[in-house]
Amino acid sequence: MDLARQKFSRLLEEQENLKKHGVCIRVLGDLPLLPLDIQELIAQAVLATRNYNKCFLNVCFAYTSRHEISNAVREMAWGVEQGLLEPSDVSESLLDKCLYTSNSPDPDLLIRTSGEVRLSDFLLWQTTHSCLVFQSVLWPEYSFWNLCEAILRFQMNHSALQKARDSYMEERRRQQMERDQAYVTQKLQQEGFASHGDSRRRRTLLQKCTTMREERIQGFLQALEHKRVDFFERLCPVSA
């Protein structure tokens, strides 16, 4: 933990450079597991840079992918419990938005060094359609040419990965449309229409359903962001 204290203290000393280059620091993980003084250093770094948006430094600390996913599920359950979401709003797409990495795109390329051929519970959800490159070189010895090899492998597989990603997103959209259509059919039946209903009424209900869902989700995500910021502000009220 001494190394973490040194590094986060150094980041706080570099606030002018962070501001100059617009670096936003994000620390991803189960932070309450850490010693309180390190939590406070992290909170200061995160709050001091949260409005910068030129580049982003994501630091996974006290992090496992299984915890990240289970935490995202708990956050969605909290949203339903608080009345911010309907149970029907819960989806893979919403889970994406509840992950620690929600403000960053999924990685195109993940490099694992040291000859280990496993992800070690790291970004399991986010790397579904990423290029995974396993190399035997140790990290301290990683060179420009090792990076070139990894990038070349990514380029060779990019087309297939992009096709798989596009197909997956299209399937997500189709499933969401099916859920919306089922909701509209139920509403029409409650109003006494046949299952196919009036086409104009169906379109109106479908648009209303989509709009209301998006509004609920945006309200929930704002509440979730406020909840996370509040966690950091409680750790360093002076900086808040």
Describe each region flagged by the PLM.
Residues 1-240:
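Flexible, compositionally biased loop and terminal segments
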